[in-house]
């Protein structure tokens, strides 16, 4: 009994010392079953591209685990925009939108979300689309990460991070793109069942973007927490023409081939100073993609 009490005290002390707090550690408001009960289709305003207006070949900028507010990480954002500008000057393929795979904030504090707001606005403004797309700011699509909801950060994330919802999808010529809420280490049953119905309802190839990896080198903390859910997802993806599962959370990154689809856990922006370009080609009978990793310096 004393050993159990001692271990509990150590756990409690560690939690109170990590800027999370006892209340947040033992019970967190806005669980996934409340945050994300369905995977909503984006409107034409939220995803401002039509099949006719989209080129067959295009790029997508991907970032993950920026962790604004973590003073340990280098200030990569100061170098990032110069690096991205140089990349775009030497590559002619249009870059249509950006995806951020969660953990934009480190503690979920309001001050961190102010920095997030400024950062995503700069991405949008400095990478405006061509005249064909009315020179609109480049859309930045977010998925929510576990750090984003610390300290009751969910509402701040929802207010700050476009498209202001945590589970959604859109379609391009040959693909369906799904963005899922795994910030609690699980999809939860409502989101899972809605996703399952939507995936089965379409034969198109599909991409999945979310924060938590499926496997992550077998490290429990960095993988989806429920082994049964993970097995269900792998089976579901194999049945419904999923081609890519793209995640963050595990900062060193990883790659796995499940025969039917591939899992890319991309390297983090905050810890490793990396961003990524997803190259898409929808000109053939089947879409083709590859992911290029760019060091900031």
Where are these regions (language model features)?
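C-terminal motif of bacterial Sec signal peptides marking the signal peptidase cleavage site
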Residues: 14-17
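A short acidic, helix-capping loop that chelates divalent metal ions and anchors anionic groups
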Residues: 70-71, 151-152, 216-219
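Glycine-rich phosphate-binding loop signature in dinucleotide/nucleotide-binding domains
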Residues: 87-94, 198-204, 239
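Active-site neighborhood of phospho(di)ester-bond hydrolases with catalytic His/Asp-centered motifs
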Residues: 62-64, 96-103, 138-146, 180, ...
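Extended active-site neighborhood of metal-dependent phosphoesterases/phosphodiesterases
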Residues: 30-51, 109-201, 223, 229-238, ...
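Active-site-proximal segments of metal-dependent phosphoesterases and phosphodiesterases across multiple
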Residues: 203-244
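Sec-dependent signal peptide recognition
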Residues: 2-9
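N-terminal active-site segment of His-dependent metallophosphoesterases
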Residues: 19-113
């Amino acid at each position: 009994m004393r050993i159990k009490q001692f271990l509990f005290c150590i756990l409690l002390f560690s939690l109170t010392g990590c800027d999370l707090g006892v209340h947040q550690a033992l019970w967190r408001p806005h669980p996934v079953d409340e945050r994300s009960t369905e995977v909503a289709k984006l409107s034409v305003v939220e995803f401002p591209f039509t099949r006719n207006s989209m080129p067959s070949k295009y790029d997508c900028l991907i970032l993950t685990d920026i962790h604004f507010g973590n003073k340990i990480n280098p200030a990569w954002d100061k170098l990032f925009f110069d690096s991205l500008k140089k990349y775009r000057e030497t590559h002619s393929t249009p870059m249509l939108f950006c995806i951020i795979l969660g953990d934009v904030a480190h503690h979920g504090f309001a001050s961190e979300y102010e920095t997030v707001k400024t950062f995503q606005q700069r991405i949008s403004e400095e990478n405006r689309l061509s005249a064909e797309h009315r020179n609109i700011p480049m859309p930045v699509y977010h998925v929510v990460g576990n750090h984003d909801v610390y300290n009751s950060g969910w509402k701040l994330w929802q207010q700050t991070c476009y498209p202001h919802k945590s589970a959604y999808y859109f379609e391009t010529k040959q693909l369906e793109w799904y963005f899922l809420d795994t910030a609690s280490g699980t999809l939860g049953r409502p989101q899972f069942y809605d996703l399952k119905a939507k995936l089965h309802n379409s034969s198109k190839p599909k991409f999945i973007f979310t924060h938590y990896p499926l496997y992550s080198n077998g490290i429990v903390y960095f993988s989806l927490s429920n082994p049964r859910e993970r097995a269900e997802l792998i089976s579901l993806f194999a049945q419904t023409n999923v081609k890519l599962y793209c995640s963050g959370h595990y900062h060193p990154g990883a790659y796995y081939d499940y025969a039917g689809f591939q899992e890319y856990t991309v390297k983090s922006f905050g810890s490793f100073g990396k961003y990524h370009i997803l190259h898409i080609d929808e000109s053939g009978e089947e879409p083709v993609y590859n992911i290029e990793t760019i060091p900031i310096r």
